[in-house]
Swiss-Prot record:
Gene3D superfamilies: Metal-dependent hydrolases. Pathway: Quinol/quinone metabolism; menaquinone biosynthesis. Its cofactor is Zn(2+). This is Aminodeoxyfutalosine deaminase. Catalyzes the deamination of aminodeoxyfutalosine (AFL) into futalosine (FL), a step in the biosynthesis of menaquinone (MK, vitamin K2). Is very poorly efficient on 1-(6-amino-9H-purin-9-yl)-1-deoxy-N-ethyl-beta-D-ribofuranuronamide (NECA), adenosine, 5'-methylthioadenosine, 5'-deoxyadenosine, 2'-deoxyadenosine, and AMP as substrate. Disulfide bonds: none annotated. It comes from Acidothermus cellulolyticus (strain ATCC 43068 / DSM 8971 / 11B). Belongs to the metallo-dependent hydrolases superfamily. Adenosine and AMP deaminases family.
Length: 356
């Protein structure tokens, strides 16, 4: 095979740094886990729950998130989520995943910290043993949470560093509470060996017309992150683009998610190619693939159609990954052994994708 031969999108190795593990759970699995845990849902069939998965706004997404994540209560639930996603992602070429999970909400509903962390870590170990996919974990709090609970999350993350927890983050409504209110909670992260990987800059414009660049800038100044999940609001602010580039911050971008939540109106206008052209390392991820009906092949295809080559995404993934040097070396070897497509003309796919 030469770089000019057609290359299957599924065959190209992929690194995913932005996926919420709770958002990978498909409707049938939600119903199964709810039944296993003796929990009642407002719907009883896969079709009824699938209808709720068709979100068109961020508010729709948050309502669904609360409904579906509340069924996860036991270590076996959390472990199953990781293993199931690793199996599906492998079919799309995933070789390394940094999965996000949200322990604070579960703790507030009576689930123990250890139950959550043990379950997800066991799932990461099983994902590699059963499917050969390296999974690392980044627990995440939400803006609006009690800062002391967030600090406790960071402390627990440090205790599980040797089981694959590599970073910590914060997400949710960017204007619910200023990120600086959580600066003290995240301050110990570096000494614990953890990278800080918050969500910010998801919306270039908020519904009231305010710029998303302001909350992105505030998050960068408050937390000094190594990566930003989303970050597309930076594209409208050249000074902020310069800050991100100079600090070496990697952006974990999710095109389909941005379309589904209304962050952008048209994939053809997505800022990913502008950010990449500005010298910012960008990865693409699925965010919440079960909710947004997407997968890694689809996201890489969208990026390719926007002019961002898969090798560039893969190399940015290595740059941003919080794994140890041995794993990074392994990922570089995979990249070096791959025949990468050099133009979108050689990028063949059977994956579903939005027209651009």
């Amino acid at each position: 095979m030469t770089p000019h031969d057609p290359v299957s999108v599924e065959a190209v190795p992929k690194i995913e740094l932005h996926v919420h593990l709770e958002g990978t759970v498909e409707p049938a699995t939600v119903l199964d886990i709810a039944a296993r845990n003796g929990l009642a849902l407002p719907v009883s069939t896969v079709d009824e729950l699938s209808a709720l998965y068709r979100v068109t706004t961020f508010s729709d997404f948050l309502r669904l998130w609360i409904l579906t994540t509340n069924v996860l209560r036991k270590a076996e639930d959390f472990s199953q989520v990781v293993v199931d996603y690793a199996r599906r992602a492998k079919r799309h070429g995933a070789v390394y995943i940094e999965g996000i999970f949200s322990p604070v909400e579960r703790v507030m509903r009576g689930v123990g910290w250890a139950e959550i962390f043990d379950g997800y870590c066991e799932g990461a170990e099983r994902a590699y043993a059963e499917h050969g996919v390296v999974v690392r974990l980044t627990p995440e709090a939400y803006r609006g949470a009690d800062p002391e609970l967030v600090a406790e999350m960071v402390r627990y993350a440090g205790r599980y560093r040797d089981r694959g927890v590599v970073g910590v983050g914060i997400g949710g409504d960017e204007r619910a509470r200023p990120t600086r209110h959580y600066a003290a909670a995240f301050a110990p992260a570096v000494d614990l060996g953890l990278g800080v990987v918050p969500h910010a800059g998801e919306f270039p414009l908020f519904p009231d017309g305010a710029s998303g660049a302001a909350t992105l800038r505030e998050t960068i100044e408050a937390l000094n992150p190594v990566r930003i999940r989303h970050g597309i609001a930076a594209a409208a602010d050249p000074a902020l683009v310069a800050v991100i580039r100079e600090r070496g911050i990697v952006l974990d971008v999710c095109p389909t998610s941005n379309l589904r939540t209304g962050a952008i109106r048209d994939l053809a206008d997505h800022p990913l190619p502008r950010l990449a052209a500005a010298g910012i390392p960008c990865t693409v991820g699925t965010d919440d693939p079960a909710v947004f009906d997407t997968d890694l092949s689809r996201e890489f295809t969208i990026a390719a159609r926007l002019g961002v080559e898969p090798r560039l995404l893969y190399d940015a993934g290595i740059t941003g990954a919080l794994c140890d040097d041995d794993v990074k070396s392994h990922l570089r070897q995979i990249g070096a052994a791959t025949t990468w497509p050099t133009t979108t003309a050689t990028w063949s796919t059977t994956a579903a994708g939005e027209s651009l």
